[in-house]
């Protein structure tokens, strides 16, 4: 069986990392070798200090993540032995990377208010100030997502859209299993029942 990539996309703070980890664990329970790959592992070191908000937003969108390297790594991996292994790629703006043909896309949706609340909680735990976090949200994360959604329309292209406003009760908004092989569909069902 061929190797597969499944992409878990969504706003910053939508619960992608948590959902992707649950999906990888469920795939393993279905007998697959599953690994997580985070778009955050492909960040470029960029100094945002002193930039005007519009310049900061543009730099974040255009240069912060090395999407070409993501695409190269996935292509090389997907061309490996037909062992049925799965990579669960999670992160923001994933359609900017060149994903292997047939990659199912799962998009997690949350309100801007809930995303902001989660980002604040996450980043305060990392020692950032509320002011610094609000600046990142307003100058990088949300403007980049607006631009990404206008350019790539992930909601229209998604195989699965999940309302993840409540982590404990994710709700399927739309689902097409056409590109979800049975083990992936079963793993997704397991995650949706368990969350």
List each language-model region with its residue ranges.
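Post-Walker A helix-loop "phosphate-sensing" segment adjacent to the P-loop in P-loop NTPases
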Residues: 25-35
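Conserved nucleotide-sensing/catalytic segment adjacent to the nucleotide-binding pocket
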Residues: 35-38, 43-89
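P-loop (Walker A) phosphate-binding loop of NTP-binding proteins
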Residues: 11
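Hydrophobic positions on the alpha1 helix immediately C-terminal to the Walker A/P-loop
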Residues: 19
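ATP-dependent NMP and nucleoside kinases share a basic, alpha-helical "lid"
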Residues: 87-125
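Conserved lysine of the Walker
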Residues: 16
